[in-house]
Amino acid sequence: MKITPVNEKIGAFVEDVNLNSLAIHEFETLYQALLRHKVLFFRDQPLSTEEHIALGQRFGALEPPHPFFPHLTDNDQVVIIETARGNPPSKSYWHTDMTWQVVPPKCSILHAQFVPEQGGDTIWCDMAGVWADLSAAEQSELRSLETIHALHAFEDSRYDHLDANGESIVIKRSRDYPPIRRPMMQVHPETGQEVLFINEQFTRSIINWSESASQLRLSALFSKARQVQYQVRFSWQKGSVAIWDNRATQHFAVTDYGDTPRRLHRVTVQGEPSLAGKPYLP
């Protein structure tokens, strides 16, 4: 197995490995590499649905079905991320997966089924690196702050529609996922790194701040995730796999390919109770 870092902060390519048949020592090497590099990239991995699920289960129990994303008919734990002719992707946002639920996921495994010849890259950002580069004064202030995470970003998206009563399905299902309050800084449960745990898509506001002050401060912090020194960018090919640590990163899907067909399958691993948020009760 050969592991080649992309840069000093985030990302590594893994070669000479078959994800279908990892020995125990190989999996442990990969796991430690994931903690170190935060996102791992693989080429030419012909995973079946069963093999994809089995790989995910080696990292932990899988998340139940996503409330909005489509999934495979024969296994609802495999999410389909797809663009088809006449159905281009929605607007993309920087995000950490599913921070709107009480316990955010541990990691995700994305497998490319077919992709455009050009475009459709994904970019990841090292949010531990962003936090580490804040000034001591900024860190001191942010440690005391909490933010609200919510499902609002799905409203009016391609995943939203009206039910038979004319009600938004996102708003309706959001009742099962009320807003969550989280510390702005969270400690990674395995590495001990401090992480700026906010994201553009699901972090709505800072608790006890005015709307204007909250958005101004969040926007300034979000802008740091757009700085290339914290990023790694991956170009997909058929059979490519990316595994990322959801507790230390956020990511962005580049939607520069119009409605060219693109399909990826994702399994997501449940997170640790130590990172559980609390219901927000205004």
Across the structure, where does each feature detected by a protein language model lie?
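Non-heme Fe(II) oxygenase catalytic core, chiefly the N-lobe of the double-stranded beta-helix
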Residues: 1-241, 246-282
